[in-house]
């Protein structure tokens, strides 16, 4: 049977209990990954809003051959909370990939209808270059805001490794450079003496009080309350996140969340979250301590993602970060489903707080 004939046999419907194992196996096959079923359950079943209703499937002969899946979250939009979905894990088995107007289009149409029926105000996503072009051309995706990926080097090891043959020399130069960079990090900036900084592995309900303090610093951002932060950073299987909390007189006044991973010849650090009260010294100290932690763990360079108009950029620039194009996807797109949100407000870059934590890929 050729591909066009296979596409003609497709039916589109919603996820049903019991589909998860086949779905996860399809994901692992298409993306050559080894994701556990437990991670699938964390991602879709345990998300702040049950995301299983937003998994749309393509079936052929009773077999799942494609999906359009979203995770559902609460979005702070001005002075209210609206339901949002973020597109993730969208795929079609290679044997059924034909015209992009085929299975993908049918999945997207059903996903749109499902979002509207379930009271979703807006959907957004962080597509790669190919997905960005296809989404804008065929699926009515619109550019949301301008985001930037910021870069800071913590060691010259990975850069030298591509140019110098002698491993000993590369490792020695990398070690020396990391010491020098760490020294300059340590001597720059002052800490607030009354603020206590603690590395923690969990959140408790007190984080909700912090959320109430900081939520109005931005008009639009994903709700970062106890439910969301615990799900995103503490309950994920194989959790690799490191949480630094700042407290003043027993109350949380800021947090930075970081991670690092090895990729090819480099160890890459990520600033997943950077959020604090309006005190530049607290933000500065959190970033400094986060960078020192990453440096001690032999990270070669660090990436952060911010809205291009976010005031927190100033703190990153003070720590030596600079914009770097091409190092990570920097597109963010949206589809509006409700009159409860306005395009002119959604697309105002100055209103948003965005981080790597908003994307499921990091």
Q: Locations of the language-model features?
A:
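Membrane-interface helix-loop-helix junctions at boundaries between adjacent transmembrane segments
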Residues: 96-98, 104-108, 112-136
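Short loop segments at secondary-structure junctions
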Residues: 60-62, 95-96, 155, 249-250, ...
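A conserved beta-strand-loop-helix scaffold within acyl/acetyltransferase catalytic domains
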Residues: 10-90, 129-130, 197-275
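Active-site/acyl-donor-binding loops of N-acyltransferases
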Residues: 2-7, 72, 121-179, 232-234, ...
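Conserved N-terminal entry element of GNAT/NAT acetyltransferase domains
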Residues: 1-18, 180-203
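Conserved acetyl-CoA-binding loop-helix of GNAT-fold acetyltransferases
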Residues: 92, 97-113, 280-292
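Secondary-structure boundary elements
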Residues: 62, 113-121, 250, 296
């Amino acid at each position: 049977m050729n591909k066009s004939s296979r596409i003609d046999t497709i039916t589109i419907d919603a996820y049903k209990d019991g589909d998860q194992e086949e779905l996860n196996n399809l994901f692992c096959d298409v993306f050559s990954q080894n994701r556990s079923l437990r991670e699938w359950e964390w991602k879709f079943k345990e998300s702040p809003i049950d995301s299983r209703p937003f998994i749309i499937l393509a079936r052929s002969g009773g077999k799942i051959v494609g999906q359009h899946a979203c995770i559902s979250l609460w979005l702070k939009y001005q002075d209210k909370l609206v339901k949002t979905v973020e597109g993730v894990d969208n795929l079609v088995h290679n044997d059924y990939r034909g015209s992009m107007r085929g299975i993908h289009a049918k999945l997207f149409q059903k996903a749109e209808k499902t979002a509207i029926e379930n009271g979703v105000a807006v959907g957004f996503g962080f597509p790669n270059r190919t997905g960005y072009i296809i989404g804008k051309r065929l699926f009515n995706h619109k550019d949301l805001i301008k985001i930037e990926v910021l870069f800071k080097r913590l060691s010259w090891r990975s850069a030298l490794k591509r140019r110098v043959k002698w491993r000993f020399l590369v490792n020695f130069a990398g070690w020396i450079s990391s010491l020098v960079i760490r020294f300059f990090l340590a001597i720059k900036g002052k800490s607030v003496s009354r603020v206590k900084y603690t590395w923690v592995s969990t959140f408790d309900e007190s984080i909700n009080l912090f959320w109430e303090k900081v939520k109005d610093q931005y008009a639009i951002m994903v709700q970062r309350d106890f439910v969301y932060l615990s799900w995103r950073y503490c309950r994920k299987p194989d959790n690799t996140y490191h949480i630094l909390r700042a407290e003043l007189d027993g109350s949380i006044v800021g947090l930075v969340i970081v991670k690092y991973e090895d990729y090819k010849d480099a160890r890459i650090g990520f600033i997943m979250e950077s959020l604090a009260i309006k005190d530049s010294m607290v933000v500065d100290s959190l970033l400094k301590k986060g960078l020192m932690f990453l440096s001690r763990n032999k990270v070669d360079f660090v990436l952060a993602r911010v809205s291009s108009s976010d005031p927190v950029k100033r703190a990153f620039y003070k720590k030596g970060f600079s914009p770097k194009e091409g190092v990570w996807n920097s597109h963010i797109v949206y589809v509006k489903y409700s009159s409860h949100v306005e395009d002119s407000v959604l697309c105002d870059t100055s209103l948003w707080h965005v981080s790597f934590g908003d994307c499921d890929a990091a």
